[in-house]
Each structure stands twice: as C-alpha cells, then as structure tokens.
Amino acid sequence: ADQLAHSAIAPTGPAWQQIRERFGTEVFDEHGMVDRPKLGTLVFASYEARAALNKIVHPHVRVAISEWFTDLERLPSHCFGIVAIPLYFESSNAAPFDKIIVTACRSDTQLARVRMRGLSLHEARQRIDAQLPTDQKVRHADYAIWTDGRRADTDRRVQAISRELSAFSTT
C-alpha cells in the first residue's frame, strides 16, 4: 500500500493536485515532488491534517488494491494475495479482507526503528502515538508476527501462516 500511496502522490498521480490544493506549495520540493518529510511533519503534528491527507490518498489506494485483486483472481494458479498496509486499522474505511496479519514488536523496539529513519525522539513518538496501540492491533488480527526476536523465529512464523493461508484459500 505504501508503494500505491507513493504513486498516488507523484506528479502524475491522481492525488497530487488535491495535496497541492489542501496543503500548499510548501510541502513540495523544487521538482514538484511531494516532500514527504515536510508533509510527514505536518500531518503527524495535526490530526486534522492527517485525516485530510488520508481522505485524499486512501481512496486511490483502495481502488488500486481492488484492481490488483481482480487481476490476481484471473490467474489460474493463484493461492492468496497479501497486501501490506502499514496503517490498516487507523484507516477509517479499512477494506475488508479474509484474514488480517499484523507484524508487531515491543514498544522500545518500535521507537528505535522509527528513530532509525532520522526522526527526533519527539517526531518518532508523534508517529507512534498516531497509531493504534500494538496490543489492540494484535487483538483485532487473525495472526500476529512478532519481529523482536531472531530472524529465524520470524521466518518460521511466516511459513506457518503461509501454510495455513494456503489451506484456507483452497477451501
């Protein structure tokens, strides 16, 4: 979904003009590209700005996901499709899926990972606070993949879920 959102806000994307009209030229660079760090600072500091951006971008992402699944269904050998949607539960109009998988980690790990993107402690906390708490996401999901441990443990969990989903998709 992140790639679809990036495409939607590109200069040739369907959301570009709406972002320009709503947020102004200050969130664009000299080449006409959305300056994602500037826009991120703005939308994670204001619920209203974040809601406005989501209202602009999410419909385009939902259409693209729907088209992708339609194309997938036409393939003779498809088992299941996976869509990575970072803010699935935070989206007011979350699309229905047969199964939901959440990747999760401890809060200290989450904070460290967000900080690795070059954000200040304050900015990182703003972004985390804008999300549904991990324990709530895990409760709403069909599967949870905890990513704090060893890579091999995560890989085993992914394989187990994949086997279960393969069985589910053939029923």
Where are these regions (language model features)?
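Small-molecule kinase domains that catalyze NTP-dependent phosphoryl transfer to phosphate-bearing small molecules
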Residues: 65, 94-96, 112, 116-171
